[in-house]
């Protein structure tokens, strides 16, 4: 849908959404986002220019539908997919893309680490109408035959540009983890739980040199500026357990991410900040406020956070609790967690479960923040329930298939779609029906 929009800007020296916004130009992408969000296009432009909102939209992903991540927009969710060395199948990842889009993921990250990574990514982008994000260090390591000591800045930049050419709309870059933070890591209960962060630690300790993503950050920005790839500044030192939440390692890295944010903005590159992780409920609001302060109000993109460490098999629920709170306090995007978190590679059904849990969290946050129209669908659902309009209830549910499936387990016949009861209460104990009968008999 963006082919004509991108083509007419082909001769512009800079083609990032932030650049145009700062020039006072409302792009077609901004117009599209404004309609979807129900906001004024000029507000979208101002938020993008200020850095409080990003529109991740690589100039080479032409069939992508524009979307916005920022405090003024609806709370978004990201779904992770990707192969591993033990399970690498492009068709399987495409199936996950379809599930992600069916159930409402706003962005998708391809975290593949096994198989033909370029081919998998190409298929993922081809089938995606939402922005695709990646973590380039995974392919960099893959292309170095899994020998982190063979990583060079030239190899790093080559992979980053290759992925940008393919149409990746945002990169997680682990540039804020500096060599001097290693003593802080040693004090932790669980050390480093970020894959990218642990790889950077291994490289830095092998060479006793500074993080190459940090030293080559200007070169990375040049690539992002060329293709309008947004940066998702990775939290290599996010807490992986409640005991490590809000510690010095996490917060010192966050300060560096704030410095890198300003560098990116100097080159008109859009930025969001990645956040924890595992955080007790009583620390979530503080984490949001600290990010806003340290990182100049750049959009905050959080993984959960999980509010307990003992929910294995149900981490999508433990994290959705924290995600709803984070969204309420000001996080702009929530990275989903599936039931397989900490246990294994998620399949398509796990992806569905994670997305729906996070759609609930994001929607709850939008209602709590008073976003315009957020509660309209809830009010419509209430009307449908009170009227016993079963088909309308299924239609309005975040997961219509699951709602219908559960109803039909006990009352599958079509006649029960007109019934004024469900199998929970039956025809004699339905509170709605009893209330309606009272009002009909005695008046309101």
Swiss-Prot record:
Q: Which family does it belong to?
A: Belongs to the ThiC family.
Q: Which organism is it from?
A: Nitratiruptor sp. (strain SB155-2)
Its cellular-component GO annotations read: cytosol
**Annotated pathway, please?**
Cofactor biosynthesis; thiamine diphosphate biosynthesis
Which gene underlies this protein? thiC
List the protein's name.
Answer: Phosphomethylpyrimidine synthase
Q: What is the lineage of its organism?
A: Bacteria, Pseudomonadati, Campylobacterota, Epsilonproteobacteria, Nautiliales
Q: Does the keyword Ribosomal protein apply?
A: no
Query: Which residues does the record give as substrate binding sites?
Result: 80, 109, 138, 174, 194-196, 235-238, 274, 301
Lineage: superkingdom: Bacteria
GO MF annotations for this entry? 4 iron, 4 sulfur cluster binding; carbon-carbon lyase activity; zinc ion binding
Subunit structure, interactors included: Homodimer.
Task: Show the Pfam families listed in the entry.
Answer: ThiC_Rad_SAM
Cited InterPro entries? ThiC, ThiC/Bza_core_dom, ThiC/BzaA/B
């Amino acid at each position: 849908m963006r082919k004509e929009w991108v083509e007419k800007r082909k001769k512009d020296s800079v083609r990032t959404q932030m650049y145009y916004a700062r020039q006072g130009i409302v792009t077609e992408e901004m117009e599209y986002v404004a309609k979807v969000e129900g906001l004024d296009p000029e507000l979208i432009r101002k938020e993008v220019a200020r850095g409080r909102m990003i529109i991740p939209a690589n100039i080479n992903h032409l069939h992508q539908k524009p979307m916005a991540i920022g405090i003024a927009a609806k709370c978004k969710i990201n779904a992770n997919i990707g192969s591993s060395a033990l399970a690498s199948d492009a068709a399987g990842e495409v199936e996950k893309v379809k599930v992600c889009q069916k159930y409402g993921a706003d962005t998708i990250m391809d975290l593949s680490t096994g198989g033909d990574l370029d081919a998998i990514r190409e298929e993922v982008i081809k089938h995606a109408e939402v922005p695709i994000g990646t973590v380039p260090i995974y392919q960099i390591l893959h292309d170095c035959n899994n020998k982190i000591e063979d990583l060079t800045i030239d190899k790093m930049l080559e992979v980053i540009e290759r992925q940008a050419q393919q149409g990746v709309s945002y990169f997680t870059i682990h540039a804020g983890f500096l060599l001097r933070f290693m003593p802080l890591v040693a004090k932790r209960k669980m050390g480093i739980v970020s894959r990218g962060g642990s790889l950077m630690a291994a490289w830095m300790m092998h060479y006793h040199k500074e993080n190459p993503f940090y030293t080559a950050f200007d070169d990375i920005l040049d690539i992002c500026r060329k293709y309008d790839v947004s940066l998702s500044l990775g939290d290599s030192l996010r807490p992986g357990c409640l005991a490590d939440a809000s510690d010095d390692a996490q917060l010192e890295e966050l300060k560096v991410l704030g410095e890198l944010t300003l560098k990116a903005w100097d080159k008109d590159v859009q930025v969001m900040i990645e956040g924890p992780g595992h955080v007790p409920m009583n620390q979530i609001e503080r984490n949001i406020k600290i990010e806003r302060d340290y990182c100049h109000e750049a959009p905050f993109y959080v993984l959960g956070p999980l509010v307990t460490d003992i929910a294995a098999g149900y981490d999508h629920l433990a994290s959705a609790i924290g995600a709803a709170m984070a969204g309420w306090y000001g996080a702009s995007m929530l990275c989903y967690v599936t039931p397989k978190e900490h246990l294994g590679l998620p399949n398509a059904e796990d992806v569905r479960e994670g997305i729906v849990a996070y759609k609930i969290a994001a929607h709850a946050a939008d209602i709590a923040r008073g976003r315009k129209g957020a509660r309209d669908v809830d009010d419509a659902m209430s009307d449908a329930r009170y009227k016993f309009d079963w088909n309308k209830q299924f239609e309005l549910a975040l997961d219509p298939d699951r709602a219908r499936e559960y109803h039909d387990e006990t009352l599958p016949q079509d006649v029960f779609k007109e019934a004024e009861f469900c199998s929970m209460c039956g025809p004699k104990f339905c509170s709605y029906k009893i209330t309606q009968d009272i009002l009909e008999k005695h008046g309101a």
